[in-house]
A protein has these predicted regions:
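Beta-lactam-recognizing serine transpeptidase/beta-lactamase-like catalytic domain environment
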Residues: 2, 26-73, 78-188
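Conserved, well-ordered alpha-helix/loop/beta-strand core segments that scaffold catalytic motifs
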Residues: 1-26
Length: 188
């Protein structure tokens, strides 16, 4: 389902962005949200399969399918969706985010409380951690299982990496840190 024109345009943009930010590597993945088809999958550095003997292993590593990444703050909306899906929270609820929880802090500290919406908009780790704790480990695991987070990506490439994370044995702190995208890693 790769669209070669889109693939080439995205590859050029990826290379340009990597150069602009002096990055060592990068990956892009465009998916049709209606049916899950992969429209473009790009890696940099890459290699010419017709001249594989001239490439190094770094160029042959498929970062889109073989590497796992912690999702970080991009995971906060999933935590909120989980809480709403389980009828544990609603968008009007407020959470006090004024004090750190153990080692969990916000990059920009907040005074008082934030709504569920503002926890996502303002990217509050403390707020996402509190929502995740309210959801609880059991429901968190059930939700992850339901959406396939414990499964290897269902793609016809044998090198696809399975998710990383101790899916059967995490405690209170892990439940909270997973709420803002740390402690669990998946392929893009």
């Amino acid at each position: 389902t790769i669209d070669i024109n889109l693939q080439n345009a995205v590859q050029e943009e990826l290379e340009s962005t990597i150069e602009k930010f002096s990055a060592d590597s990068g990956v892009s993945l465009l998916i049709n949200i209606k049916n899950g088809e992969i429209l473009s999958l790009n890696n940099f550095p890459d290699f010419n399969p017709n001249r594989i003997n001239l490439s190094n292993t770094n160029g042959r590593f498929n970062r889109a399918l073989q590497a796992n990444y912690e999702m970080g703050s991009t995971f906060k909306p999933i935590t909120v969706a989980m809480g709403i899906d389980e009828n544990i929270i609603n968008k009007e609820m407020l959470f006090d985010v004024s004090k750190p929880i153990n080692s969990i802090r916000d990059y920009h500290p907040f005074i008082g409380s934030l709504s569920v919406k503002d926890i996502v908009v303002q990217s509050s780790n403390i707020g996402a951690a509190k929502i995740a704790y309210k959801i609880g480990k059991k429901k968190q695991i059930e939700f992850f299982r339901k959406i396939g987070f414990f499964e290897k990506v269902n793609i016809q490439i044998k090198e696809a990496a399975p998710p990383l994370g101790n899916k059967n044995n995490w405690g209170k702190l892990e439940t909270m840190t997973i709420g803002f995208g740390h402690g669990f890693a998946v392929t893009p």
